[in-house]
Amino acid sequence: MMHFKSGLELTELQNMTVPEDDNVSNDSNDFTEVENGQINSKFISDRESRRSLTNSHLEKRKCDEYIPGTTSLGMSVFNLSNAIMGSGILGLAFALANTGILLFLILLTSVTLLSIYSINLLLICSKETGCMVYEKLGEQVFGTTGKLVIFGATSLQNTGAMLSYLFIVKNELPSAIKSLMGEEDAFSAWYVDGRVLVVMVTFGIILPLCLLKNLGYLGYTSGFSLSCMMFFLIVVIYKKFQTPCMSVEQNSTVSANVTDACTPKYVTFNSKTVYALPTIAFAFVCHPSVLPIYSELKDRSQKKMQMVSNISFFAMFVMYFLTAIFGYLTFYEKVQSDLLHKYQSTGDILILTVRLAVIVAVILTVPVLFFTVRSSLFELAKKTKFHLCRHVLVTIILLIIINLLVIFIPSMKDIFGVVGVTSANMLIFILPSSLYLKITNQDGDKGTQRIWAALFLGLGVLFSLISIPLVIYDWACSSGTDEGH
């Protein structure tokens, strides 16, 4: 997903100063019962319990390093929308084609509402602990294990996003070059091979950007990326009315088959239906960016940030649904997991323009995500001090691994499927609910909320138990030919 910068510094929330409890003071007025020269054990137990409470307040305040936010509500909505928006939008028409309009709308609405609820849980956890960094929140609640799990989930999500962006380069750059050369799609040469081009782009453009110590241009790329995706949506809607369904079925000779192929399906099930929910989940993940955006919000409060998330998710819901429905109604069951790849840019300046804009946007966004993944690795290895040789070596090795994956992964649906059922599920369902349940473990006043959070956690676990085996089963049963190529 498009990630929000927040000054490349993840600030933390400062809670109200915890008032000192007079009962916990070491007053000389405390009365100590002595029996046979020994202090009453009940008193010791009570004293230790109160000291433990004081220590817990001190622990809570470890996260209270606060710089007041300066970002307006409107700009925060824009930043969160940037964080939500990503390559997932290109796979939604494919998800709709394999579920039907009605079922897709139900799934899209459900994931939108559940994502908003998970952010609500995350904000409550942040308020209770005072932490404004996702990883530190995990460490505060679950210790080192929590920190490692959140690092792993966010790194996998960012890696999946990078893979999808580079897959767009692999898919779209050859078509753009052929169009600029005036060649047909059938034209083949080594310099229009997507595998060669993605390696050239990675080590010619992305590597130098990733080697920088800081990314000063980060604030500009997210806005540019969101603008490109909005431009893409406008083109998708426009092309629906410019592309007759008959042209999709160029090889069809039977009009009855064409008529059937051009009829929208409202509910459908097939072997690719399993990818719908992971793709939608992948498209809505923004949780690692929520707390940094919250920390920058002017006059922040949980209610105000919840309003930011509600507006952002509603806007993305509308944008996602429009892209999916118009993309589907243009190509019907012939739509691919990369919607943009289905449009022919030869002789079409509009498609060529949007294709080039999206390519530039994703190329500039990859280093942003790469910085996050590399920083996480250095943090885990406790190698936070800058070292040039290590910096260069790790960067090159990671980019080689990512390129190999992009070259051999057959289609974008596989990326959406794997990341959707693993890290996206963790970040949306499992982690926020687990953190909330742990934090409110001793709070008897939140019984109803804890039941809902437990059901939410169970839903995430169920999602994994059902989706992961089905995705693996589809891989095992898939033929050599793939629609995503």
Swiss-Prot record:
Post-translational modification: N-glycosylation plays an important role in the L-glutamine transport.
Biological classification of the source: Eukaryota, Metazoa, Chordata, Craniata, Vertebrata
Annotated catalysed reactions: L-glutamine(in) + Na(+)(in) = L-glutamine(out) + Na(+)(out); L-alanine(in) + Na(+)(in) = L-alanine(out) + Na(+)(out); L-histidine(in) + Na(+)(in) = L-histidine(out) + Na(+)(out); L-asparagine(in) + Na(+)(in) = L-asparagine(out) + Na(+)(out)
Residues modified as Phosphothreonine: T11, T54
Disulfide partners: C245-C262
Result of altering N310Q: Does not affect N-glycosylation. Abolishes Nglycosylation. Does not affect cell membrane localization
Residue numbers of Phosphoserine PTMs: S6, S25, S28, S49, S52, S56
Tissue occurrence: Specifically expressed in brain and retina (at protein level). Also detected in spleen, small intestine and lung.
Protein name (record): Sodium-coupled neutral amino acid symporter 1
Topological domains, Extracellular: 98-112, 170-188, 238-273, 332-348, 413-414, 472-485
Regulation: Inhibited by alpha-(methylamino)isobutyric acid (MeAIB). Inhibited by lithium, potassium, choline ions, N-methylglucamine. The pH dependence has an allosteric effect on the transport.
Domain of life of the native organism: Eukaryota
Transmembrane segments: 75-97, 113-133, 149-169, 189-211, 217-237, 274-294, 311-331, 349-369, 392-412, 415-435, 451-471
Topology in the lipid bilayer: Multi-pass membrane protein
Entry-linked InterPro entries: AA_transpt_TM
Residues carrying a glycan: N251, N257
Native source organism of the sequence: Mus musculus
